[in-house]
Amino acid sequence: MKVLQEKILNEGKVLSGDVLKVDAFLNHQIDPVLMQEIGKEFAKRFKEENITKIVTIESSGIAPAVMAALELGVKVIFARKRKSLTLQDNMYVANVYSFTKQETNEISLSRNHIDENDRVLIIDDFLANGQAALGLMSLVEQSGASIAGIGIVIEKAFQDGGKKLREQGVRVESLAEIASLDNGTVTFVQQETAEVK
């Protein structure tokens, strides 16, 4: 997705060979026009899949998930990382290791909002080692719902998450695939190398 790649090049910051900071438009400050385009692109790619619900994880997956849901005319349910006083019982639960935060979180979805009749599109902001996506897949599988695919805003293709998911036969659609962050430079898969400011 060209507009997303341009945004990464213009506003993203490479912090290391593993970490790309995109808080200027995706996971802290949100660019709603970009999110709208991302939502349209996910909807276009998954329109034939009869999606009934989108599942994501708080908090950075919510904006792209809501925009895709708006385009598809479905609801979004987001997995919580923290326990809520109002959501105690009747939950699907999985453990997810965060590459960025270097910690394990227990994530959960209410059983009241997803069931075996749902066809789910999972959406998240990043795909690195695949732990968040695998955790979300576990929650969806616990509900008995089927998984139509996974939509990723930015995939770090140099890490093994995408490979793990695709080897399981899951359809993964990434809007920007990064081949490398070496030397402070973003290199997209099948794209020219460009310097990040």
Swiss-Prot record:
Converts the preformed base xanthine, a product of nucleic acid breakdown, to xanthosine 5'-monophosphate (XMP), so it can be reused for RNA or DNA synthesis. 5-phospho-alpha-D-ribose 1-diphosphate binds at residues 128-132. Pathway: Purine metabolism; XMP biosynthesis via salvage pathway; XMP from xanthine: step 1/1. InterPro entries: PRibTrfase_dom, PRTase-like, Pur/Pyrimidine_PRTase, Xanthine_PRibTrfase. It comes from the Bacteria. Homodimer. Its main location: cytoplasm. Keywords: Cytoplasm, Glycosyltransferase, Purine salvage, Transferase. GO terms for molecular function: xanthine phosphoribosyltransferase activity. This is Xanthine phosphoribosyltransferase. Its EC number is 2.4.2.22. Belongs to the purine/pyrimidine phosphoribosyltransferase family. Xpt subfamily. Xanthine binds at residues 20, 27, 156. GO terms for biological process: purine ribonucleoside salvage; xanthine metabolic process; XMP salvage. GO terms for cellular component: cytoplasm. It is found in: Cytoplasm. It catalyses: XMP + diphosphate = xanthine + 5-phospho-alpha-D-ribose 1-diphosphate. It comes from Bacillus mycoides (strain KBAB4) (Bacillus weihenstephanensis).
